[in-house]
Regions:
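C-terminal structured "cap/appendage" subdomains that terminate the fold
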Residues: 535-556, 563-568
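Periplasmic polypeptide-binding modules associated with outer-membrane biogenesis and secretion
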Residues: 29-262, 274, 290-299, 445-447
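Gram-negative/organellar outer-membrane beta-barrel architecture
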Residues: 29-33, 191-192, 207-401, 563, ...
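Gram-negative bacterial Sec-dependent N-terminal signal peptides
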Residues: 2-27
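Transmembrane beta-barrel strands of outer-membrane/channel proteins
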Residues: 231, 256-260, 273, 289-293, ...
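Hydrophobic core residues within well-ordered beta-strands of beta-rich domains
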Residues: 271, 343, 359, 388, ...
């Protein structure tokens, strides 16, 4: 009983002491040993949100790369009867017995594709003079070349059967119209979603080039579903029927994660479970839901977005949160707790899309709230941030790799909290480089700048240290309003992928184990009132690692980081630190296919067309990408 009384008394004294130290700051409270509330439990909100953003970005890069393909030769298969190319009608005759005939007037059927000026520029060459049948045929061929240059390969000019009398001649035009448009095999995608994006309307002039472009674009930007178009002669003369065949994967995915990227005060070891969908309500709307768990923290999250236009503009809602309690360390008796939330309503819109270049815009309205409670007298501090942000995201493919760049402008409005009134500028860059022979380089960098020396809620500060930033240090040990981060990593095979046994080649460990060497560096600069150590601003480390594909669907990233700079914020100093992440992502689609009793239909093999001299896709083999992100842990 006496021990319990002494313990409670000690808690009360420590709590009152903490309150006294909090008077001069509405957020940070220090004891004589330099203890900060936000760095122990409050920062879990920022720490976990940052980790989720890192995962989201890695997943974006992975999906973007894996979906990048050159146009398939059979994206559009033409099964209609083909014309021989001879548009001369042998029934054309002339009254004169000579080899030439006078043409005074040429009548051409109305066209929805070619303008009168374009047609007149061709037929004017044979009007008002004697011409041969060959010259008339040449004019017809010129019109067909004009059709071909526009991509309308189903349109053609021809000479109908006629007798040339009085110098008058008629050139006929056939401009095929779209007939019936049907979609097959789309269990998880609405028919209207597909037909809205192939751009072919019934009774409109059929454009095969536009159709192929639409099909390739659809396959490029819609994960888990691909289209193939078959063309057939329409049931109505002068029309082309389009049959869209859909191949879909099961749209729901499960991912389990375990790592040691948690904070020491709430538990280094974390577990997580995530469910995400590629087409929740059959409109290619994406949903992610899940949570991370550690000894002292729970971090649930939810994200949902839906396409709102044919150019893949998306509106979405994001919710992330952290409920944390300090359970480890010298200050666990203070009963420190934190509750953090972030709500975002966002809109993303591709602005430019080319095979080797993409520019996207992103805008969002955010509401963030964080509350820290401690002590048995329930003392608390609360921060609220209402903000708006706008960003541009760029992807540029080069001969040996890909660039990703981001630039964001952010403003916090003083609506709910007068202190929250500031601008924030941030950006990032990533370079993936293929050195060939299985050697891949990855460069990453980001920065954040908040002008002035005002108090900034920790929810909008930048932090560094740990698995996703500077390896070799504890997770999230540094935080400040300004900062930067740089990392370089080289990923390479450490063993051969195949070995020869006798006359046969067998798979070897190089297929499942990759080596890695890295160097990380960061600088974090807090405002002067929060600069406890006045100069301990930098982190730097080097290290090595392994990326392993375990049997089944289990993958892992293992790193050993060695600090090069002794940082005073690092209370648990180690010469080297081990980081790991294990991810279990079962391929549900493959499992369902194994259980399926449906008859497997073998498609007729179509001979591929020769590749162009300068193929757009520099990475047709997606295994290149596995060297970068062979851990599919990013579910967002």
């Amino acid at each position: 009983m006496n021990k319990s009384f002494i313990k409670n008394t000690l808690k009360l004294m420590l709590s009152i002491s903490m309150v006294a130290l909090s008077v001069n700051s509405s957020f940070a409270a220090y004891n004589p040993n330099g203890f900060t509330l936000q760095q122990e439990t409050g920062l879990n909100q920022l720490h976990d949100t940052s980790n989720l953003e890192n995962r989201r970005y890695e997943n974006y890069v992975k999906q973007d790369y894996q979906n990048y393909r050159t146009p398939m030769p059979d994206a559009v298969k033409d099964e209609r009867p083909q014309y021989s190319g001879n548009t001369m009608n042998t029934g054309v005759s002339q009254t004169q017995s000579t080899n030439s005939v006078y043409i005074g007037n040429v009548t051409v059927d109305p066209s929805e594709i070619l303008s009168p000026e374009e047609i007149n520029s061709i037929i004017s060459q044979i009007q008002g003079r004697n011409v041969t049948i060959g010259e008339i045929q040449q004019a017809v061929n010129e019109i067909n070349k004009l059709y071909a240059s526009r991509g309308f390969v189903t349109a053609r000019a021809y000479l109908p059967e006629q007798t040339i009398t009085g110098g008058n001649i008629r050139i006929g035009l056939i401009e095929s119209k779209v007939g019936n448009l049907t979609v097959n095999g789309n269990r998880w995608t609405r028919t209207k979603y597909i037909t809205d994006r192939v751009g072919q309307e019934p009774n409109k002039v059929f454009d095969i080039v536009e159709l192929e472009k639409d099909v390739v674009s659809f396959n490029r930007y819609n994960e888990g579903v691909s289209l193939k178009a078959n063309l057939k002669a329409g049931t109505t003369p002068g029309t082309t029927d389009i049959q869209i065949n859909t191949e879909e994967k099961f749209p729901f995915h499960l991912v389990g994660v375990m790592d040691n990227a948690g904070r020491y005060s709430t538990g280094h070891i974390r577990g997580g479970a995530m469910l995400y969908a590629d087409s929740l309500f059959k409109n290619r709307d994406k949903m992610s839901i899940g949570s991370y768990f550690s000894g002292g923290a729970t971090s649930p999250f939810f994200d949902y977005n839906v396409p709102v236009n044919k150019k893949d503009g998306r509106v979405g809602f994001l919710f992330t949160s952290t409920f944390a309690k300090l359970k480890y360390g010298d200050y666990r008796a203070l009963d420190i707790r934190s509750h953090g939330y972030q709500y975002s309503l966002y809109y993303s819109q591709p602005l430019i899309r080319r095979p080797d270049f993409e520019l996207k815009s992103y805008t969002a309205l955010n509401y963030k709230r964080a509350r820290i409670e401690y002590g048995i007298i329930d003392y608390h501090t609360t921060d609220e941030v209402t903000s708006a942000e706008a960003a541009l995201n760029l992807r540029k493919d080069t001969k040996h790799g890909i660039w990703y760049l981001n630039q964001t402008a952010y403003y916090a409005f003083p609506i709910l909290d007068k202190v929250s009134n500031y601008f924030k500028y941030s950006g990032s860059v990533t370079r993936l480089h293929d050195f060939s022979h299985g050697v891949i380089g990855q460069l990453r960098g980001n920065y954040q700048v908040i002008p002035n020396n005002k108090y900034i809620p920790y929810l909008d500060q930048i932090q560094s240290g740990g698995l996703f930033t500077v390896r070799g240090y504890n997770e999230g040990i540094m935080i400040g309003k300004n900062g930067y981060f740089m990392s370089g990593e080289l990923i390479f095979p450490i063993m051969p992928s195949n070995i020869r046994i006798g006359e046969k080649e067998r798979p070897f460990l190089g297929r499942v184990v990759k080596g890695a060497l890295f160097a990380d560096h960061a600088g974090i600069f807090p405002r002067r009132a929060e600069d406890r150590y006045d100069g301990s601003y930098f982190l730097a480390s080097v290290g090595m690692g392994l990326r392993i594909q375990f049997p089944g669907s289990l993958t892992g990233r293992l790193y050993w980081g060695f600090p090069l700079i002794e940082n005073r914020y690092e209370t648990d100093k180690k010469y080297g630190r081990f980081h790991f992440e294990l991810t279990l992502a079962p391929d549900i689609d493959a499992l369902l296919n194994r259980r399926s009793t449906k008859e497997v239909v073998v498609e007729e093999r179509v001979e591929a067309k020769p590749a162009p001299n300068e193929p757009v896709n520099n990475y047709p083999d997606v295994r290149h990408y596995d060297y970068f992100f062979d851990v599919p842990g990013a579910a967002l």
